[in-house]
Each structure stands twice: as structure tokens, then as C-alpha cells.
Swiss-Prot record:
Inhibited by 4-O-MeGlcA. Changing V230G: Little influence on the glucuronosidase activity. The active site is at E312 (proton donor), D385 (proton acceptor), E413 (proton acceptor). This is Extracellular xylan exo-alpha-(1->2)-glucuronosidase. It catalyses: Hydrolysis of (1->2)-alpha-D-(4-O-methyl)glucuronosyl links in the main chain of hardwood xylans. Changing D385C: Loss of glucuronosidase activity. Beta-D-glucuronate binds at N231. It is found in: Cell outer membrane. Pfam families: Glyco_hydro_67C, Glyco_hydro_67M, Glyco_hydro_67N.
Amino acid sequence: MSTFARLFLCLVFFASLQPAMAQTEDGYDMWLRYQPIADQTLLKTYQKQIRHLHVAGDSPTINAAAAELQRGLSGLLNKPIVARDEKLKDYSLVIGTPDNSPLIASLNLGERLQALGAEGYLLEQTRINKRHVVIVAANSDVGVLYGSFHLLRLIQTQHALEKLSLSSAPRLQHRVVNHWDNLNRVVERGYAGLSLWDWGSLPNYLAPRYTDYARINASLGINGTVINNVNADPRVLSDQFLQKIAALADAFRPYGIKMYLSINFNSPRAFGDVDTADPLDPRVQQWWKTRAQKIYSYIPDFGGFLVKADSEGQPGPQGYGRDHAEGANMLAAALKPFGGVVFWRAFVYHPDIEDRFRGAYDEFMPLDGKFADNVILQIKNGPIDFQPREPFSALFAGMSRTNMMMEFQITQEYFGFATHLAYQGPLFEESLKTETHARGEGSTIGNILEGKVFKTRHTGMAGVINPGTDRNWTGHPFVQSSWYAFGRMAWDHQISAATAADEWLRMTFSNQPAFIEPVKQMMLVSREAGVNYRSPLGLTHLYSQGDHYGPAPWTDDLPRADWTAVYYHRASKTGIGFNRTKTGSNALAQYPEPIAKAWGDLNSVPEDLILWFHHLSWDHRMQSGRNLWQELVHKYYQGVEQVRAMQRTWDQQEAYVDAARFAQVKALLQVQEREAVRWRNSCVLYFQSVAGRPIPANYEQPEHDLEYYKMLARTTYVPEPWHPASSSRVLK
């Protein structure tokens, strides 16, 4: 390590101490919160086991790993730990690869490291030259970085280092976060401030927050970021913006994070260079090849494009009589000489189809096997749109000859924005562990994504995170936990929601068991609570249109039927639910036969999906013994009670949480309880008005009538223009 690098690391170390000394807890550090180990016995043990940091190599990534270890160990062990490459001392932490570290090379780890690939790593307590050491070894510098973060996580979560011996490698290749950031810094479906990217000061000024953003993602093994909205502005490909984006790419590169861009399919026309964007027109093909060359001249390791095409008004190849494969392959050809890929979103639904549920499958399945090998279909977990609970997208089980990756949503578009606590880990786990039967037993979504089922070339997972300039990045402190769970599951889809929650709580708040266990259980139930007070039993899309915040199950008068709530629930005097069996839209036929058979049968379909696939009588007998009307009411009331239980749990944690974050979560849970009651009352009263059935007397009765809640929907979030006749009643 050069003298300059050592000086740089020292400056990083001392600079990192200043914010901790000057600021109270505000959530900025996320899970990289390196506070001293509170258990004094354990602290002394760690202090004995790691006394020195030995670093070989001088790449930006090795320097980033060394800086993180200095920062983390000095904080956790409550004593300065400085990186050196001098003579090995007893009880050192040694990091490196066999190529850049003679000490690592001396351990002859060749076969063990070879099995871990380019990004995997090995952590082990061993001896070198009779000296006690802990090693972080990998085949590449980025593997060393990932291993360094893992070692810090072990100490943060108070795992023993005695006899440490573990290895880890990612199961998925592309582990990517998506931002829906516009160039004016407004974040679509973002609830935590403005966009992180300050275009006005780039490329000259790189805010320290950009490096912290890279650290946060690298700590999870995330290796790519798409920094702009899928509803893309063509100007993102201009020289003016490419200069700025290149500066961001430079900041992210030491942390193993590739830069990707969302592109507008009509960009050749928008730039005025050609009068068409037809993907089979040679002029258009050449335009994209030339533009790709320009991008790579700015960003040599550019990852590729994310494309939303022929969806919700965005242009695409269908506007020129071409299909998705022809559009994607044209872009893929432009990127292929540079090693770039195309993430092509499968989120499509046209207004002229009988059932929106069927849209993506019917459009993409005929194209299976026609996409280029550097095209990856980016498919949402369900067939509609990030609803609180959806069945899995049938595309995952069907597209056996096409690269596919998952798209999850971390930003809470349908879970109460930044005001509701709704840990998404259980949703991710539920999806990834779903058995599709695509190739018999073991064909889980996770295994399909990994390439184990269909042997695809590219694998991956994307998460729409949408952080912003709020000090804590995500608005609600617990939205951080969903970001964390996404990253951990993108690295290893077999990690459970409970494990991710446990780690996050320990790293973010406290290791005290009296805190961990109740709050972890609160987190694990929070997603189900959100389902229950919004859309239980397989109901879906009951939101106020546009903002997607509050309830509006009565919506029936929008330009497109599939934007209304009544389209989905189909409630009437006699029953409720969407018939997707053979006697209905037959969307169930898109699934493998074992799934179609089980979900088409009222005796075997899971009750939490039943109204997705069946239109049932209000008198249908449920597993609880209640009829469907009674069960629906019960679920709505159960959701509110679950939120109230979450409040009681959090109220008991004041001794374990700093005052600022405790007060913020407490206040937000009060908002959530109020909104859960509004959801419950709005939906129960509306469905009562349709079914003509009473709310059982043993339940808390709504304070207001249905018309009140209809009016309230217009003023709670993004109010409609002022109309005294329709708004005055709400304001009384």
C-alpha cells in the first residue's frame, strides 16, 4: 500500500469520526452504524482477536475495503484500528487476494477460492507464520470488499469469531437497484425528499452522500444501479448529462457498482437525428450503436439499459409494428460489443384485453426464445402491479428459453408511502420460495431466477428503492429494513425474512434480546397487517387512483376500466371476486398444471388468494366457519388490531432506542393506525352497501357513513382542486 493510500485512509478514518461526534441518531448511517459493542466482555474478546489491520494492494476497491474496516472496527471496538502493510503482527486482520497479498497466497486457498467465483469470499480464523489472524480472502478486490462488510456485520450482530470459517458467493449475477428519479429531481413514487442526484453541481462536485450511497449498497453485495426513471427523459443520453453521470459512475466504481440508465425508446427521434425509432430501420440501429459508443467513452464499464416500452404511454417497438424481441434485440446489438445488457421490463397491459392479469403473459410467451442472449426480461413479482399480495407472475414458470430477473418494490407505493411500517421481507420471501412446478418439485421462483431450473445465461434481481434527500434516506426508518432484506435476498434468495430482520435490527438499533424478539415479530406481521386492512382474501387494487395511498373501492368512472377498483373486485349483491377459472377469463391456464388445478379448486386454493381467482357468494363457507362476508369483515378488523398491537410493542422499546428515532416511529404508527381505521371503514362500508349485509355488532362500528369516507379520499393525499360543494362536509 502506497504512502498516499495510507494517508488517504487516515484522513477517511478521522473524517468519519466527526459526524458521529457532532450528531445525534438520525438514521443516516442506516445499518452501517458502527457504535461500540455494549457487552464489555464481548468487546474485550473482539479487541483481543483483532488488534491490527494488514492490507496489501492499492486499488480503489481495496482502499475502499480498508477504509470501511478502519471506520467500522475503530467504532465497534472503541479503539483506533489503522490499515498497514508492514510486517505481520499477531492478532491481525489480513485482507486481500492471492494476487495482491503474499500472506493470502501463502495459505494455498486456490481450490476453495475457485469455487467462490469472481465475487465470493472466504472469512477464516487461522495462523500465518505462527501468528493468529483473521482473513478476508477472495479472487477479486470486490470480493474482498464484500467479505469485509460481512465481517463487520458479524461483529455488529455479535457473532463469535473463534474458529470462524465461512464462505459466501452470490447466487444471482445482476443485483440491481432501480431509481424512478426524474431529471428535475422529482422522484416518481418517492416519499423521502428530492432525488439524490444534484445535477446542478455535477460533475464538478461529488457530494459525500454519493459515496455513502455506494457503501450502503455494496454492504449488501448490490452491484448495479439504474439512476433514472423508467419513464425516461431522452436527454439523459446527451453529452451534458453523460458527463454528470460519468462522475457518479466514478464514485460508485470502487464499490463494485455498475451504472445503468433507463432509456426512452424514441430517443433517436427526440434528438432529431432520424424521423423514426423503428428498430428494424438501419438508421435507427446505427444511431443506437453510435450512442452506445459515446456512452462507453464516458463510462467504460457501463452496465446497459433498462427499458419500459409500450406501457402506460411509453413508446416502444409496437408503435412501428414490431414486437418486444425486435426492439430489445436492436438495443442489445448496440451494447454487445462492450459487454452491456438490456433489462427489458415485462410490465405491459393494454386496454383492449379482457383481463389485465393475462396481459404480460399473453404478450411475451409467444416470444420465448427470440430474445438475444444479453437481454434479460425484468418481471414484477406478480401479474398486476406490486399489490400487497399477488400470485406469482406466470411468466417465471413459462419463459424457459429467456433470461429473466425479478423486480420487487421497496418504496411503499401500495403500502402507505413513508408513513406506514410495512417490512417487505415476508413478501420477498413468499415470492422467492413459491413452488411453481415448472419442472417438477424444486422449481421455486428463487431457483428459476438462479438459473437452476431453465439454465439461463443471465440471472438477477432488481429492487425499486427510490430513496431521497431525507436525512434517513427512506422517510420511514423501517423502509430501510426492506432495502436491507432485498439486498440480502438478492445475494442469497434462501435467506429468510426473519434472518434479515434480525440482522437489520441488531445493526440499526440494538442487540438486546428484549428489544430484538418483540420488534422482529412486529416487523414480520407488518406486511400481513397491511394486506388485511387494505385488500384481504385476494382482493386487489382498491386504491384511490393516481396517488395509490388511500382507499377507494367504489372507483368506477375512469378512462380505462382496468384503472378502476370495481374492475378487480366485481362485488355485487350476490358475491365478490374475479373469476379467472375456465368459466371466466381462464388466466389460471397460464400456470403449470399443478398450480392451475390447485388454485382452480375451491378446496385447495389458498384463502389469501381466493378472490384473485374465484367469484364467490357472500354465503360461501370459509375455513374459519364464517361465511365470506363475515370473514372479509373479520380480516379488515384484524388488520387494524394488528397495527394497534404494533403500537403497543413499539411503546415498550423506549429504553433501547434513541429518543429521535423512537419518537418518529411512535408518531408514524399513530398515523398508520388512523389510516388503517380509514381503510377498514371505507372498505367495509362500501362492500356493505353493495352486499346489503350488516357489520356484526361485536365489532367497533365506523364513526361516519360511507359518503364521509368518499369525500375524505379527495383531501387526504394530493387533494383535488377546491370545490366547496363537495369538500365542505369533510372539513366540518
